[in-house]
Amino acid sequence: MDVLLGAAAVAAYGAIAGYLVLNGAPNVDEGFYGLTARAAVSGLVPYHDFGYTQMPLFPYVHGAVSRLVGFGPVEQRMASGLWALLAVAVGTVFLWRRFGRAVGIGFAALLVTTLNWVYFTHLPKTYAFVGAVILVNIVILEARADFRGRMFWTSLLGVVAVGSRLPVAPFYAVVWLGLLSRDFSAANLLRALGWPAVFTLGLLAPFAAAAPRPFLFWALDFPWQSAALKYWRLDLPALFYFAPAVCLAALALGIAILSGRVRLARTRDVVLLGLLVALACNVLPVGAYEEYATPLLPGLALVLCATLGDLGIGARVVGAFYLVLCLVNLCGIPPIDPTYYADTRKASLYVRQFQRGAFPFVGSASVVALEAGRPVDPRMLMGSFCCTEDYPESQANLLRLMTPAGIAAHMEDPRCEVFVLYNRANWNFVWSMPRFQPISASAVSRWKAILSRDFRLEYGDAHYAVYVRRGVYEGK
């Protein structure tokens, strides 16, 4: 029976994940995550050789997996999904062994039916990997009682997680303080300070040393300056729609804890507090999106399920509870776009046909460069987010950014035979980094003039516009 249940769970997850890999709506970030991963495993260094809006470790992790499966958009989604699968598997096995089949299978069902979580963890972003790291860390904290082991693994995995996605730092700050406060001694303080310092020096310091100014710009200045100009706030109904069952269960657990009906196991209270603090820091500030909760959901689900397991409720009641939660989850539907991958393949065929030689791909639709297997100027790896009018040419080059003049020079180069744009205006070169102010009308007019004079529209669909240089088109 256990084997059959496990096989059914794997089949259900595979069906949902496979559908969303092929039919999930495109995300503007997919191109630059894939290009930076490809660049990192080819020998280029984040910040020193190319711009990158996150901390530096993820391109190497994602690039290593993508090297096995491929760098196309579908392969990128599959590579990211492997980390989501790891999180589901580790959490399920841990809970199954400790609390029984019902709790373990329930955890898997809870995550797999959170369709927005499945969708966003199968985009080539940091969410799936960082979520898996956090979940593994929580499992270690649940399984080990010694301070040394807990702090060592929390320090190592914390540097890996924060070194991939900075906004999860509040979780590790709370857990670090909680672990130290409960087992405080001079020796433990030395360990708590020493291990994070050693891992930070080993994993992150080399990037800062290689390119100090670009490192500070991309890792700290860019998110700070860009966030200052965002004006929207995420409302709580949007968060509940994103992950209905996890949010509802967390609310119920919070009420039970505050009323004194439930007491959390040692260390689990610190973990839950860390997750909630990190969740608040990620979704409450101005300019937040509900997807920022994605890497925290597996850990939150594991804490909820482990607490349910501690209550010792019968398997049938637990199963009924999970069934209700899974039905609630069906209220949150991710964005679907069945034509995205087919259109990307078509656009890439035109790039392969008309772009001769090794001249880099030019255009904002960087995901097409991935599908076509084309090289890209390191200053343009960020795709839609590579252009700046905030800095002069010399400083932009230092920060590995393009200027409008640099893009125009690429367009006017006779070796640039194809130019590809998105058919969504705000996904193109419309924002000046990092302040997200509109690119000047004069720069846009110059680009349009070059496009009209030197190129013709060869292919267009709902997602892309592929322009081919006139002489090249006539020669074909």
Task: Walk through the language-model features, giving the residues of each.
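Short acidic/glycine- and proline-prone juxtamembrane loop motifs at membrane-interface regions
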Residues: 27, 122-129, 289-290
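Transmembrane-helix motifs of polytopic, lipid-linked glycan transferases
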Residues: 78-99, 113, 136
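Hydrophobic/aromatic-rich transmembrane helices and adjacent perimembrane loops
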Residues: 82, 130, 170-171, 279-313
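Hydrophobic, aromatic-rich transmembrane alpha-helices
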Residues: 89, 242-268, 272-279
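Specific aromatic-rich, kink-prone transmembrane helix
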Residues: 90, 110, 129-146, 152-158, ...
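Membrane-interface alpha helices of multi-pass inner-membrane proteins
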Residues: 108, 135, 150-166, 172-178, ...
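Perimembrane helix-loop-helix junctions
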Residues: 151, 171-198, 254-264, 302, ...
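Extracytoplasmic
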Residues: 167, 325-475
